[in-house]
Amino acid sequence: MTCAHSTTGAPSKPTSAPCKLFRKALQSCYVRAMTQELTTSLPTEPVRPSESPGWWRDAVIYQVYVRSFADSDGDGIGDLRGVRERLPHLAGLGVDAVWLTPFYASPQADGGYDVADYRTVDPLFGTLGDADDLVRTAHELGLRVIVDVVPNHSSDQHPWFREALADRPGGAARTRYHFRRGRGVHGELPPNDWESVFGGPAWTRTTDPDGTPGEWYLHLFAPEQPDLNWDSSEVRAEFDSVLRFWLDLGVDGFRIDVAHGMVKAAGLPDIGRTEQAKLIGSQVLPFFDQDGVHEIHRSWRRLLDSYPGDRIGVAEAWAPTSERLALYVRPDELHQAFNFQFLKCPWDAAAMRQVIDESLAATGSVGAPTTWVLSNHDVVRHTTRYADGGPGRGLARARAAALLTLALPGSSYLYQGEELGLPEVTDLPDELRQDPAFFRTSADGQDGQDGQDGFRDGCRVPLPWTRSGDSYGFGPGGSWLPQPDAWSGLSVEAQTGDPGSTLELYRGALALRRELPGLGDGPMSWLQAPAGVLALSRPGLVCTLNTLAEEVELPVPGRALLSSAPLSYGAGTVRIPPDSCAWWAI
């Protein structure tokens, strides 16, 4: 089949005739009733997806940013019950697993990545029973569940940190974190020159019980996120226990937040320059990508392997080279590591090919799959990144990039809403923003061009499910961030059944990926192609990508299976539109 290019314009408003409103209400009630019937009839004993050793090597995994996915109770914030009710959408999309962002007890200083209790569900998102129900429902639908674990830092409201603040300098409670005396005559200066990823110093000074200034503590992110000290045996034992807690509940693995950051260089040496966030991912730093993290990951691999069902660990690791990143996925370490080199790659055929070659060579050298990703909750959505000043161009390129990544060997991660072609929301009012980096960078006057720029809220706007309603079906009430009016036409309801829509393009691609044995993990070779064009061969399939601003004419590679834009043919040739990708059966 061939999918036509979809448009981003919102359709005309549905009529307000009472019969149509009644019909929509009836459909909504029916969908909810069917979902409830499905999920309440599950067996009481845990069910796991069919055993498939190495399932993760070519899995397509969908990231759910929980607070923005679906709201079940009308408070404007997504929750676990909302995710559970929408799992049939993900099963129908054709993904293999779901990754959930943190839903643990948290003051929400950084969207839940500041954890106060790693074994408790925050009431904002539901209960432990809701988490258990979600895992059971996902497994019944054939979906695996990966949850976030945040080991680099805790919340400043974690009992351990409260104990540390109450303890004396050098006390046992403080050894779980990084407390240091300041520099200067009176300790008035930070212990070193490290900067927070969110802007400003990476150190905050404490106040002793008698009111005098005390030691400083390290936080590579917000002050509300003190870094844990992984030299502490207590810290290591605690996280082993946390992992076992969630594995016992039935989760299939963990996405490890800041997997490159738990170990700091001995002595906490100065870096010697400012704007350190710009160095992340370009060189080894005293606080990131230290070799000592690998021993921790090896111990976690042993723990994961002690459970049945191929449970996995996924590294969020910023490394300067593909070779450094591959160290995280050696056979005795983690299973996957996000390929941020590919995410950062410009829309250029030569640059893409270089990153693909380097990535496949590096992971292949350790026997691991490459893990491709285009967007996540920390970066500008790729529909907007690729736009280069033209929203239509951005969507065309995003659709093409999706087909390219799904044709490459290895695993692929999708960020919620990319299957709808959602763009970044760039006009959120400052008073509604919640990203802590926004407040830090604004206060410090930083330009935010690298690292986390303080505008991550724009990729976290709640999803549109229906054409109408206060929050386009996100929940019974409003949404914690406002959705653009144009998102009516980008909703799941608006795109379902439209053969030219981005949603149906993703559904078609994922269905073919399951059907074609040559896709996923396995060999790949490059075919000859003109400048600006990529042509790659997989067993039984050819993928062509045109990154140019004009169409190119090629010999017909095979039988057209799927394309991100309409194709046209000559005598034995095909004209590939600009910024488009196509799959061909051979």
List each model region and its residues:
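Hydrophobic residues within beta-strands of alpha/beta enzymes
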Residues: 98, 254-256
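Loop/helix patches that line or flank the sugar-binding groove of alpha-linked glycan CAZymes
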Residues: 36-42, 55-57, 272-285, 295-310, ...
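Acidic/aromatic-lined carbohydrate-recognition and catalytic surfaces
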Residues: 35-244, 248, 261-320, 463, ...
